[in-house]
């Protein structure tokens, strides 16, 4: 059975454009893409609707900390969050912030983050997530580029904002702490002409009276900054329509294939709210009246928070699921021969039934009770639905968790530019394992051939760049019409990811077209920019950096500067020739340490550091098809040529970390 339908024929190649395959939709949208209900104009209506239905339902929860001990979760109701958002929006208006102005939100996941976002929704103010994982100067860049005039900031991020103020105080005029503010901080900001408030102080500036401004689908809901190919963040413009369509499409797909969220559900929030993935999930929770419980923001206590909250919905990235898989696998493997055999029998029995089409809950109830329920308890005991996104989930990990977690697991694919998920696997369709599924009900997808990489969208096994069209797409990059024109062509967004259609209509991610890739934790790596920094190390002549999207770190093939390496060897009384030196582990460690020293000097982030290198004595050349006539690296060919070395680097680096 195919889960997609063809709605447009393939496009042949022309002198200016490569060929493109047919256009497909999900079978659940065969009669047309999902349309927003008439009159729906803003995501604010999702919160106000839930308040009307169930004002006293718990909405946002966090653990109270007393004497360094975490207590139970304490909750704000839907009515309380609604009223606090109105007060905060009223206070913003009193400070001269008007509809269409920009409001920054800077901090880890917590109720105040969502209240600030909802305050923006209520008065048609554009919210701009601020976060520093895009680089050391990213917050300052986003404030200036996004023209942020007010910012809600977590207490422990106040100092970071203050360090930016000398270069952005002409724009940023108001800072509101998620909690308290010190007198010293107030004086420091006032000296620069900026007002600083505690959360309580600012709340008291607002009130619940007054009419809300008119809102429109075309309003810019958020400017969400994402990694740029050169390291400079790009501001992705997402409208109210895109956000709402994504949320309703999520509901649509869950209704058709599994079970929608409800007021009985509890979501565990720990993935960064500054990213589109978690924002969409939390917006969907609000639309359905579900509860959202926040972690403490400390990875050491994540499992403790999970056990206390006992959520029903869990979202993760491949790196998280890989760790969960490794933990389960280790426990089973160390449990003795008999226990291991019984577990494997239960696993095989349940998997066989799931392959026959039985949903996970009906595949092996007895085996669940005897073996797999203990794994479910690790998530708190109530998990019914898990999502994976941000990078491809390894096939073996997805299969293992589908069988053992006693929960439905759905893997999706999306980008900031597609407002989160644009393709999703159907949780109870076992053959979709290893794929990112079918288009959401707001999206059409096609593949475009990439001849230079050998990918043909018209072949028997269609492969090419994934292109998207639909209502959840972004409107462009803020102040970067040039970049917008590069990726939005004739209404089609060119993702830069290479996909392969499967016989059942699901999409599999197989490669990356652009010289920027994603690691397993979801971080983007602008590889050319990073290689340029590493090339400033005087010990190397050439470098090819590689990151497998199933791994969380980078490795590299390096051509050392011959004289520099030989001088290093002579100073240590090593008499090896150059080729032998390149095979010497001490030389590899020396080069690796010097490269990472260069990286630190230029403030590369932790995941941009190298964990292992292979020293290549021969320069990259055209004879081996490793470079172009203009000396540009041919990355697919480099990966093919050095694949065995790359696999060994990853294997050895992971062994060294254990």
Swiss-Prot record:
One of the Pfam families matching this protein, by short name: AMP-binding
Tissue expression profile of the protein: Mostly expressed in glandular trichomes (lupulin glands) after flowering, and, to a lower extent, in stems, leaves, cones and flowers.
An example Gene Ontology cellular component term from the record?
A: endoplasmic reticulum
Protein location: Cytoplasm, Cytosol
Chief location bin: cytoplasm
GO terms (BP aspect): cutin biosynthetic process; wax biosynthetic process
Carries keyword rRNA processing?
A: no
Residues recorded as binding ATP, renumbered to this chain, are: 226-234, 411-416, 497, 509-512, 632
- Which InterPro entries did the record assign? AMP-dep_synth/lig_dom, ANL_N_sf, LC-FACS_euk
Q: Which GO terms describe its molecular function?
A: ATP binding; CoA-ligase activity; long-chain fatty acid-CoA ligase activity
Q: Which cysteines are joined by disulfide bonds?
A: none
Cited Gene3D superfamilies: N-terminal domain of ligase-like
Q: What is its EC number?
A: 6.2.1.-
Q: Where is this region: SBD2?
A: 412-477
Enumerate the residue ranges of region (SBD1). 298-411
Source domain of life: Eukaryota
UniProt keywords (A-Z) are: ATP-binding, Cytoplasm, Ligase, Nucleotide-binding
The entry sums up its family as follows: Belongs to the ATP-dependent AMP-binding enzyme family.
Instruction: Name the PANTHER family for this protein.
Output: LONG CHAIN ACYL-COA SYNTHETASE 2, LONG-CHAIN-FATTY-ACID--COA LIGASE
**Domain remarks in the Swiss-Prot or TrEMBL record:** Both substrate-binding domains (SBD1 and SBD2) are involved in the substrate recognition, and are sufficient to confer the substrate specificity.
Task: Name it.
Answer: Probable CoA ligase CCL6
| Native organism | Humulus lupulus (European hop)
């Amino acid at each position: 059975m195919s889960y997609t339908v063809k709605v447009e024929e393939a496009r042949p190649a022309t002198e200016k454009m490569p060929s493109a395959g047919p256009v497909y939709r999900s079978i659940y949208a065969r009669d047309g893409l999902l349309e927003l209900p008439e009159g729906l104009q803003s995501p604010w209506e999702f919160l106000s609707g839930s308040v009307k239905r169930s004002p006293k339902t718990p909405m946002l929860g966090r653990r109270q900390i007393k004497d360094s001990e975490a207590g139970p979760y304490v909750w704000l109701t839907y009515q309380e969050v609604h009223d606090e958002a109105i007060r905060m929006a009223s206070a913003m208006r009193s400070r001269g912030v008007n509809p269409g102005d920009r409001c920054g939100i800077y901090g880890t996941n917590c109720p105040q983050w969502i209240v600030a976002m909802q305050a923006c929704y209520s008065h048609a103010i554009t919210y701009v997530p601020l976060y520093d994982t895009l680089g050391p100067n990213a917050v300052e860049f986003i404030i200036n580029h996004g023209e942020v005039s007010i910012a809600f900031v977590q207490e422990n991020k106040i100092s970071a904002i203050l360090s930016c103020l000398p270069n952005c105080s002409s724009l940023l005029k108001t800072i509101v702490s998620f909690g308290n503010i010190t007198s010293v901080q107030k004086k420091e900001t006032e000296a620069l002409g900026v007002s600083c408030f505690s959360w309580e102080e600012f709340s008291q500036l607002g009130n619940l009276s007054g009419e809300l401004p008119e809102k429109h689908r075309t309003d810019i809901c958020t400017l969400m900054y994402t990694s740029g190919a050169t390291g400079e963040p790009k501001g992705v413009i997402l409208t109210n329509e895109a956000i709402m369509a994504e949320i309703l499409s999520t509901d649509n797909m869950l209704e058709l294939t599994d079970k929608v969220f409800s007021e009985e559900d509890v979501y565990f929030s720990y993935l960064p709210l500054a990213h589109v993935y978690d924002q969409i999930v939390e917006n969907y929770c609000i639309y359905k009246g579900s509860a959202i419980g926040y972690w403490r923001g400390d990875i050491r206590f994540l499992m403790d928070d999970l056990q206390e909250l006992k959520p029903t919905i869990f979202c993760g990235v491949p790196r998280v699921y890989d760790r969960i898989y490794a933990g389960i696998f280790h426990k089973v493997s160390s449990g003795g021969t008999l226990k291991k055999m019984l577990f494997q029998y239960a696993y095989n029995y349940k998997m066989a039934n799931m392959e026959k089409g039985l949903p996970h809950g009906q595949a092996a109830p007895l085996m669940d009770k005897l073996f797999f329920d203990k794994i479910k308890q690790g998530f708190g005991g109530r998990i019914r639905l898990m999502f994976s996104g941000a990078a491809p989930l390894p096939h073996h990990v997805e299969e293992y968790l589908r069988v053992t977690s006693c929960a439905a697991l759905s893997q999706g694919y999306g980008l900031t530019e597609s407002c989160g998920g644009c393709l999703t696997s159907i949780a109870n369709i076992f053959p979709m394992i290893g794929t990112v599924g079918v288009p959401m009900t707001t999206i059409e997808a096609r593949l475009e051939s990439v001849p230079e990489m050998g990918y043909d969208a018209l072949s028997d096994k269609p492969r090419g760049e994934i292109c998207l069209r639909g209502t959840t797409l972004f409107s462009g990059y803020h102040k970067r019409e040039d970049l917008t024109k590069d990726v939005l062509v004739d209404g089609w967004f060119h993702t830069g990811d290479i996909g392969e259609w499967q016989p059942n209509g699901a999409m599999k991610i197989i490669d990356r077209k652009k010289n920027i890739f994603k690691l397993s934790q979801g971080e983007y790596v602008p590889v050319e920019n990073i290689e340029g920094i590493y090339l400033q190390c005087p010990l190397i002549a050439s470098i090819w950096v590689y990151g497998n999207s199933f791994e969380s770190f980078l490795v590299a093939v390096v051509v050392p500067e011959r004289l520099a390496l030989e001088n290093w060897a002579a100073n240590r009384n090593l008499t090896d020739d150059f080729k032998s030196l390149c095979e010497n582990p001490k030389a590899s460690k020396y080069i690796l340490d010097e490269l990472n020293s260069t990286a630190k000097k230029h403030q590369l982030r932790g995941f941009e550091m190298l964990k292992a290198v292979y020293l290549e004595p021969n320069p990259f050349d055209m004879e081996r098809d490793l470079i172009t006539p203009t000396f540009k690296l041919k990355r697919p060919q480099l990966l093919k040529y050095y694949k065995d070395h790359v696999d060994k680097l990853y294997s050895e680096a992971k062994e060294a970390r254990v």
